[in-house]
Amino acid sequence: MEEQQIQAYGKINLSLDVKRKRLDGYHDVCMVMQTVKLHDRIFLTREKTPGIRLSSNLDFLPTGEDNLMVKAAKLLAEEFSIKEGLSFRLEKRIPVSGGMAGGSTDAAAVLHLMNQVYALGLSIKDLEKRGVKLGADVPFCLHRGCYLSEGIGEILTPLPNLPACILLLAKPAFSLSTKAVYEALNVSAIPKEEHPDVEKFLYFLKKGDLSEITPLMGNILEKVSIAMRPEIQVLKERLLSYGADVALMSGSGPTVFALFPLEHKARAEKAYQALRYGEDRHLAQQVYLTEPWAEEGGIDE
């Protein structure tokens, strides 16, 4: 049968605060997430032979039942009694275990794609309810744009997009476990003044002036991740040395994004060349130049 495809976009955290650890082991968060144009591609072929199969361009990526894409497909296949075979092919570009919701956005894309291909009639809210069963970031990844994310990540409020700018994404050669980072976070011991001021950030985000927004970006997980891997701090400082307005870790890391205003495109390109091919290539294994996604709505809606 004809192959269907969809794009799955990555995200960065413009502001990330953790309020408390819950009794169920999750954490209540207050964070601002922005879709970026860096994306994976997912292809689906319907087959006569039953079963869910996944292949990837990355040999080290697990493709069995623990993969979130497989879990997402299985969730809808079981609920809607889809008996035919599903063969997924993943072209992965978003860093794996990099703090950019790469696994969550692929799962969200599978939900969207199956909803379209099988005409399931699920609304975005219906998909969110199913997505949160797969992971806290999946509901956000069903959308594109900028959102305030609260609760464990499932309470979403749309926001204005980050103003147009250039984003340099750099992931070191190592990965960090989100679970390990959160387990090492002692949120009750962090003074109030060290928490990102998300409310103030939102005020200036709505005004839309980058020069007022960037000083208020923050990530409460940075200190924890940097304590585990000091190389993240080295990478941040190097990106700032190229003239970035801000260099901040995304999510639990270790990917760092550097933000450059459009008028400083040459600085961004110089940093990219140095990290990708030049004297700083030891600092990052994957380096991309991208920009904020500037259109609201679900994936390929």
Identify the role of each PLM range.
Residues 14, 42-44, 69, 103, ...:
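Residue-level signal for inorganic ion chemistry
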Residues 123-134, 217, 267-276:
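Short, well-structured alpha-helical segments that form the helix of a local strand-helix-strand
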Residues 143, 147-246, 263, 270-273, ...:
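Conserved, helical-rich catalytic subdomain that frames metal- and/or nucleotide-binding sites
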Residues 1-98, 116-128, 162, 171-174:
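ATP-binding N-lobe of GHMP and related small-molecule kinases
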Residues 5, 41, 146-148, 167-169, ...:
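Conserved hydrophobic/aromatic beta-strand scaffold that supports enzyme active sites
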Residues 89-118, 136, 245-257:
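Glycine/serine-rich anion-binding loops at beta->alpha junctions
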Residues 34-35, 132-133, 139-142, 158-163, ...:
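Solvent-exposed alpha-helices and their adjacent loops that cap or buttress functional pockets
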Residues 85, 107, 111-148:
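Contiguous, small/hydrophobic- and glycine-enriched helical/loop subdomains that border
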